[in-house]
Amino acid sequence: MWVPGAGIPSRLTLSAFTRAARFCVLNSGVARWKDVPAENCRGLYDFHTQLKPDVEFGKLSSRLYKSRSETKRYVTSPRVAETVVRVLRGKRKAGQLILECNPGPGVLTRALLESGARVIALESDKNFIPELKSLGNSVNGRLEVIYCDFFKLDPRNHGMVTPPVMTSDMLFQYLGVKAHPWKKGFPLKVVGILPAKTERNTLWKILHDLYSCSSVYKYGRAELNLFISEKECRKLTANPQTPALYQSLSVLGQTACGIKVLCTEPSSLFDTYAIKGELEKQRHRESLEQNLCFVQLTPHRNLFTGTLTPFNYDVFFHMLRQCFMKRNAKLIDHLPSLSPIDAVHILKQIKKKKDVRVVDMYPKDFLRLFETIECSKDDTCKWLYDEFMEDALS
């Protein structure tokens, strides 16, 4: 069984999996890692909490973040702010710590403070920071403002970074937040709006971070409460009852998290600002008619108590992507390209008929499929892969 802990790398190569000789080259049938010594795989379960030394934000440099014409959506309607506070108040304890992403003009920030919450405001636009800090001076230390973009935490392949781009280690060390055991949850809740132009990519990054226990999830089972476009929300919550919307993102999200749509609001109630704090009009009719759904993503406590771990999640991702490439095909037709194990035997193990299609499988069925192959007694070769999979895992 995997033991959650900090220090897990954000991406893992094939050589980092828990057993040698689990993969075969698709066309040649040669075990790619057959000759890798077993001792090379030792120690993968022995991670302990090891945070980086304290870092002074001002002394870091980066070429990754360049000021460009970005637009962000903000809560500017008092009614929406009151609704958010009301739906969050249900489970929230008095004095709950809220990490608010890109609060902008601070309408939601004020509502959260008035409800008794303590707020850490991560704002990526310097133009909003003076007013937010002024608000903080009037609430007896219950608001802290940091120049940071939550959705750009821990950029992949980064060197040294400078705010608003940060690493989660920099942020949480500064806040004094320590890593928590996975089953014990997390001491704060995250509230924000997904960036409109990179919404889907941001969702994928969140899922990668969650399954690999990296970024904010290295510190515990963080609950995200995010406004997401209704279009992406419907995909995230889709299942075999809505096959046209059902996809690998749906399975990954529902396998990892409890997903609740807390409320839905029209996009017209959210103002859009350019990166310089200037109000912009929503130009496209589609964006005006699109609703935003306030979605709660709560990672499951038992996500890593079975076969799935942060060391083999990449294979689970690949299995789903491969299956949904031909979503209406029969599962039995996909299995020979995924595993050398007899396809009929696998279907019997997961108690599915030979004519079951990919879009007929619920998230729990895909997880059972993954566990069945991963726990097979055939230790020499469980999964097949080709250059496509190698690219996906790199």
Curated annotation (Swiss-Prot):
UniProt keyword annotation of Metal-binding present: no
Subcellular location: Mitochondrion
Highest taxon above the source species: Eukaryota
Lineage start: Eukaryota, Metazoa, Chordata, Craniata, Vertebrata
PROSITE patterns, per the entry: SAM_RNA_A_N6_MT (PS51689)
EC number(s) stated in the UniProt entry for this protein: 2.1.1.-
Source organism: Bos taurus
Protein name: Dimethyladenosine transferase 2, mitochondrial
Database matches in SUPFAM superfamilies: S-adenosyl-L-methionine-dependent methyltransferases
